[in-house]
From Swiss-Prot:
DNA repair among keywords: yes
Name of the protein: DNA mismatch repair protein MutS
Transmembrane segments: none
GO cellular component, one term: cytosol
Keywords for this protein: ATP-binding, DNA damage, DNA repair, DNA-binding, Nucleotide-binding
Classification via HAMAP family: MutS (MF_00096)
Chain's role: This protein is involved in the repair of mismatches in DNA. It is possible that it carries out the mismatch recognition step. This protein has a weak ATPase activity.
A molecular function GO annotation: ATP binding
SMART domains with a match to the protein in the record: MUTSac (SM00534), MUTSd (SM00533)
Taxonomic lineage: Bacteria, Pseudomonadati, Pseudomonadota, Alphaproteobacteria, Rhodobacterales
Length: 878
């Protein structure tokens, strides 16, 4: 038995070796096949059968496969499970391969490397979320982060010190992160939920990056896009290099890069995003998040824009005010808002349709999406008219000027085109004469033959003339032998060409019939070929206007988000916040949008609360006390969410809101063990608190809940106390600080700007009623035992806890020492017995000599002599 692989398997192994780190989808007819380790891994991941095909080195070759027509669903599963997939297609027909020899293998090559950050297919993407590919680069003492969504063309870059990388990745949530080999970003990428791809250092060379980017955008210089640092160029260049690698030369439609300033958006770290559940609930799903509660967008582009605005609230006052003005205008025009939303709901996702067309992965439905989007855009622009609101006026302008392209697509496409161009049937009748004729031949071949037969009968006068078909002659004209003399004589013999004579019939053909036969036999293939040519022309026409079409797509998203904010504000009674450059934070009647939504579903009302952290230039801190379950955490979170909504450009759930720009938002609310890194809940809490104290500036908003609860009572109180003092003296920021340590309420008397607030409760016949009202003042009890009873602890445990609490409180009030005696009755708290006192030791000779001295009566010389004497005594002691 030979150890040499077959030619086909040798080809497979060569392609596999050229694409390390990826599963290889190897095209064989109607299937993508996988072999060896790839087959074993894919079969397990996809839950498909693992079979065998031949042998290699004496061992059976594992094999599995997936149908080409269903490949996308399998790709999605593999990508979600962390795999990369190289797709090797057949580059020629088997017939072409045979021309090179009977044993020649069909040429194959990888046409695409599918990775988490380079998806474009509709079935592989979440319509309402971006799919970012990010890149981090460092050049000397500079670092930068770039990110791109090749499914929409959005491309941005920003300076990014290493300390800011984790928060920025949390903001963008990329699916894949590119980094130089040895960058050691595994942990940061894992925290962000991104697949890490390490590239050679050459991919991050800033000089090569400039050349790559100029080639990508077909320009001589990047100066027209702005000035970029070497690190920014390196990060963007690595993306361009990676796209060239994964797309195999079919570069996506990428917009010119936009440079973001580091401080252009409210800074929100990963822990705060998680704690506030901005875009994802703690349970892992979208439901229960702020995004789910407020998303009333009706287009995919609008939904993606909303997620970006919530993830990165603006710090530009002009930008915030312009967005708010647009929302306010639509709030005042409910009829217009309803009409806009109805029209927008019929607008497809043009951004992603454009991207697929650019990558030659699009189909007729993508052309139809462009047609429908531009058509709806024109209607929306007409609705807005000459609107004077800047945001809406700019958007309306971008929706005009597309009439020629709309007319072209409308004329060329049927109303409901099929998914794939290869299936044909998407070009409208009347658009192309050749196609119409070809289709007529394909679909009405018998009718054409019948009409031609009638014409020939009229021309020859032979009523028995027939047009027939067989596999030898193809189509032919047949008459009985009695008409042979007439048919073979002039002038008919000049037109009717003799083909065959039998005993009873004579057969002819004509030039027209031969041409018709060829056209009929080739009509189906020709019709598909013509449609493919038309598809290519239409795609090019769209891509030639990719810039304006992309602007129109973004305009639709902007209008959709504005109308969605207006609909939300009108429906939920939200108000326009006053946002300025001050340090104010005054909320009247504030509500938590997610909790309020959940309560409404149950037919319950949310209790609104005020918050006032305005203290001029001094720190403004509320120290919030109150029982468990009273709503402290909800109050903390709702004020943070109100700040985010205000700076995102929307209205807020309150009666009135005045918010000075928030530069940073920090939240230390709730924690869990980080077992993977060996961190306890308390350690996680301390790490998050340290980040706040080390970073928060005087325009930050900080919310802290139960600092110090994970350790001993006095340790926890000490830490919480010190944290409060640091926030007040050093950070000097606006803060809400919730605690169960009632001793801390005394800080309000000695720290200017610190105020006590409490969540009110009422006791009624032994029951605790939570009022959920935040009032000025301090709580005197936590009602923990009552909450334990409500939670369902056994009555015996609740009664015992009440007794212990009573004794502890009595002892503390009276100073009798009873708490210590009580704790000694509890095994967990009983102190270990003190060791017996040791007997009194006998004094040494050195001690006796020192005691005999009077320091005031000896001279310097005597003191020096005494030192030598004492040293001699020490040396002589046993």
């Amino acid at each position: 038995m030979s150890d040499q692989p077959t030619p086909m398997m040798a080809q497979y192994l060569a392609i596999r070796e050229a694409n390390p780190g990826a599963l290889l989808f190897y095209r064989m007819g109607d299937f993508y096949e996988m072999f060896f380790e790839d087959a074993v891994a894919a079969a397990a991941a996809l839950d498909i059968a693992l079979t065998k095909r031949g042998t290699h080195l004496g061992e059976p070759i594992p094999m599995c496969g997936v149908p080409v027509h269903a490949a996308e669903s399998y790709l999605l599963t593999l990508i979600r499970k962390g795999f990369r997939v190289a797709i090797a297609e057949q580059m020629e027909d088997p017939a072409e391969a045979k021309k090179r020899g009977s044993k020649s293998v069909v040429a194959r090559d990888v046409v695409r490397l599918v990775t988490p950050g380079t998806l474009t297919e509709e079935s592989l993407l979440e319509a309402r979320r971006h799919n970012f590919l990010a890149s981090f680069a460092s050049v000397r003492d500079e670092s930068a982060l770039a990110w791109v969504d090749i499914s929409t063309g959005a491309f941005r870059v920003m300076p990014c010190p290493p300390a800011r990388l984790a928060p920025e990745l949390a903001r963008h949530a990329p699916r894949e992160l590119l980094a130089a080999e040895g960058a050691n970003l595994d942990e940061i990428a894992a925290e962000a939920g991104a697949a890490l791809t390490e590239l050679p250092g050459g991919s991050f060379d800033s000089s090569a990056a400039t050349r790559r980017l100029c080639a990508l955008f077909s320009v001589e210089t990047l100066d027209g896009f702005g000035q970029f640092s070497r690190a920014e160029l390196a990060a963007m260049g690595a993306i361009a290099d990676y796209l060239e690698l994964t797309q195999k030369g079919r570069m996506p439609l990428i917009r010119p890069p936009v440079r973001e300033a580091l401080g252009g958006a409210m800074q929100i770290d990963a822990a705060t995003r998680r704690n506030l559940e901005l875009t994802q609930a703690l349970s892992g799903g979208r439901e229960g998040s702020l995004l789910a509660a407020i998303d009333r967008s009706v287009t995919a582009g609008g939904a993606r824009l909303l997620e970006r605005r919530i993830s990165a609230p603006s710090r530009d006052l002009d930008e915030i005010h312009a967005r708010q003005a647009a929302v306010a205008h639509l709030v005042d025009e409910p009829r217009l808002t309803a009409d806009l939303r109805e029209a927008l709901s019929r607008a497809p996702d043009m951004d992603r349709a454009l991207s697929r067309l650019a990558l030659e992965r699009g189909g007729p439905r993508d052309l139809a999406a462009i047609r429908a989007g531009l058509t709806q855009g024109a209607a929306i622009a007409a609705m807005l008219g000459n609107d004077e609101i800047a945001v809406l006026a700019e958007a309306a302008h971008d929706l005009t000027g597309h009439d020629a392209l709309i007319d072209l697509l409308d004329e060329a496409l049927v109303a409901e085109p099929p998914l794939l161009a290869r299936d044909g049937g998407f070009v409208a009748p009347g658009y192309d004469e050749d196609l119409d004729e070809t289709r007529r031949l394909r679909d009405e071949g018998r009718g054409v033959i019948a009409r031609m037969q009638a014409d020939y009968i009229a021309e020859t006068g032979v009523q028995s003339l027939k047009i027939k078909h067989n596999n030898v002659l193809g189509y032919f004209i047949e008459t009985t032998s009695t008409h042979a003399e007439r048919m073979l004589a002039p002038p008919l013999n000049e037109r009717f060409i003799h083909r065959q004579t039998t005993a009873n019939q004579i057969r002819f053909t004509t030039v027209e019939l031969s041409e018709l036969e060829t056209r009929i036999l080739n009509a189906r293939d020709r019709a598909l070929e013509i449609e493919r040519e038309i598809f290519a022309r239409l795609s090019r026409a769209v891509l030639d206007r990719a810039g304006p079409v992309g602007q129109a797509a973004r305009a639709l998203a902007e209008i959709d988000l504005t109308a969605a904010f207006a609909d939300l504000a009108s429906g939920e009674g939200w108000v326009r916040p006053e946002v300025d450059a001050s340090r104010a934070f005054v909320i009247e009647g504030g509500r938590h949008p997610v909790v309020e939504r959940a309560l409404k579903r149950k037919g319950e009302a949310f209790v609104a609360n005020d918050c006032a952290l305005t203290q001029g230039e001094t720190p403004a801190i509320w120290l919030l006390t109150g029982p468990n379950m009273a709503g402290k955490s909800t109050f903390l979170r709702q004020n943070a969410l109100i700040a985010i909504l205000a700076q995102a450009g929307g209205f807020v759930p309150a009666r009135r809101a005045h918010i000075g720009l928030v530069s940073q938002l920090f939240s230390r609310v709730g924690a869990a063990d980080d077992l993977a890194r060996g961190r306890s809940t308390f350690m996680v809490e301390m790490v998050e608190t340290a980040a706040i104290l080390n970073q928060a500036d005087d325009h930050a908003l900080v919310i802290l809940d139960e600092i110090g609860r994970g350790t001993a009572t006095w340790d926890g109180l000490s830490i919480a106390w010190a944290v409060m003092e640091h926030l007040h003296a050093t950070n000097r920021c606006r803060a809400l600080f919730a605690t169960h340590y009632h001793e801390m309420t005394s800080l309000s008397a000695r720290l200017p700007g610190v105020e006590n607030a409490t969540v009110a409760v009422r006791e009624w016949e032994g029951e605790v009623i939570f009022l959920h009202e935040v009032r000025k003042g301090a709580a005197d009890r936590s009602y923990g035992v009552q909450v334990a009873r409500l939670a369902g602890l056994p009555p015996s445990v609740v009664d015992r806890a009440r007794d212990i609490l009573h004794q502890l409180e009595s002892g503390e009030r009276q100073g009798t020492g009873k708490p210590a005696a009580l704790l000694d009755d509890l095994p967990l708290f009983r102190a270990a017995p003190a060791p017996a006192p040791a007997g009194k030791a006998k004094p040494s000779v050195v001690e006796d000599r020192l005691r005999s001295l009077n320091p005031d009566t000896i001279s310097a010389r005597e003191a020096l002599d005494l030192v030598y004497e004492l040293r001699g005594m020490l040396d002589g002691e046993p």
